[in-house]
């Protein structure tokens, strides 16, 4: 499968710097607020916006949020589906991911099979990604019936990541879970990064620029933040939080 426009954009930007993606969950964010957040992301030059969530927003709810983001943001909007329903024709691309450490084959290949023809019909760019849940896993781990990687076992995470690469996945995502008390451990990030040759995404539990700085220093290529922005009391507060997180990427 050829590398598409959005994936090429990611690789070209990674040649120059580490990246920061913002995750917006349509279950928790109205189209109006999503549009305002997207405008802030545009002004701060956030590298991409991901749209999705573990509880599976879909249909008109998802479409309206994606459209509001697209109206206010010129860079890629990438779907991050919790299941096969989380697909919108208005996005630029989709992380076509497999939850490698799920106990349930539905989240490894089942949901992907159910969603594949819709991705093709909408002419969405699929970006193959290995998705790995790390303790505590939070809602993503519970919904995805994952067997979370123990935080003190970085080699297990590295084994899954390398397996994902060998299966043809072109990105690896280490997920501690939205709202996790702590991010993925730096030692795990470093161990995984040494094992693989594809870009490494890290998300979940990231609340400060200092945490971002440490994760980037450990080897994260792309940092994903979501809950930290969604929980802000106002758009201006969200802007300040994003500015702090953004500074951590620029080490």
Curated annotation (Swiss-Prot):
Q: Which cofactor does it need?
A: Mg(2+)
Q: What is its EC number?
A: 2.5.1.41
Which InterPro entries does this entry report, sorted A to Z?
GGGP/HepGP_synthase_sf, GGGP_HepGP_synthase, GGGP_synth, IGPS_HisA/HisF
Which reaction is this enzyme known to catalyze?
sn-glycerol 1-phosphate + (2E,6E,10E)-geranylgeranyl diphosphate = sn-3-O-(geranylgeranyl)glycerol 1-phosphate + diphosphate
Question: Principal localization?
Answer: cytoplasm
Q: What class of enzyme is it?
A: transferase
* Gene Ontology biological process terms from the UniProt entry: glycerophospholipid biosynthetic process
Q: Name one GO cellular component term.
A: cytoplasm
Q: What does this protein do?
A: Prenyltransferase that catalyzes the transfer of the geranylgeranyl moiety of geranylgeranyl diphosphate (GGPP) to the C3 hydroxyl of sn-glycerol-1-phosphate (G1P). This reaction is the first ether-bond-formation step in the biosynthesis of archaeal membrane lipids.
Which named protein is this? Geranylgeranylglyceryl phosphate synthase
Which organism does this record belong to? Answer: Pyrococcus furiosus (strain ATCC 43587 / DSM 3638 / JCM 8422 / Vc1)
């Amino acid at each position: 499968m050829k590398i598409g426009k959005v994936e090429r954009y990611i690789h070209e930007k990674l040649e120059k710097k580490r990246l920061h993606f913002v995750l917006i969950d349509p279950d928790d964010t109205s189209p109006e607020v999503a549009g305002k957040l997207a405008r802030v992301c545009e002004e701060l030059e956030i590298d991409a916006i991901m749209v999705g969530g573990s509880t599976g927003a879909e249909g008109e709810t998802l479409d309206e949020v994606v459209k509001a983001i697209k109206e206010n943001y010129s860079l890629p909007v990438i779907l991050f589906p919790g299941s096969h329903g989380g697909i919108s024709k208005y996005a630029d691309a989709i992380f076509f991911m497999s939850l490698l450490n799920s106990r349930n084959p539905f989240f490894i290949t089942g949901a992907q099979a159910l969603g594949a023809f819709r991705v093709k019909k909408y002419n969405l760019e699929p970006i193959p990604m290995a998705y790995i849940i790390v303790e505590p896993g939070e809602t993503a781990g519970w919904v995805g019936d994952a067997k979370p990687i123990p935080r003190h076992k970085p080699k297990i995470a590295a084994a899954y990541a390398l397996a994902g690469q060998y299966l043809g996945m072109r990105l690896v995502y280490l997920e501690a879970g939205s709202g996790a008390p702590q991010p993925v451990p730096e030692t795990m990030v470093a161990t995984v990064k040494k094992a693989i040759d594809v870009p490494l995404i890290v998300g979940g539990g990231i609340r400060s620029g200092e945490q971002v700085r440490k994760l980037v220093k450990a080897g994260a290529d792309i940092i994903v933040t979501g809950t930290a922005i969604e929980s802000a009391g106002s758009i201006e507060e969200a802007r300040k939080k994003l500015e702090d997180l953004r500074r951590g990427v620029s080490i």
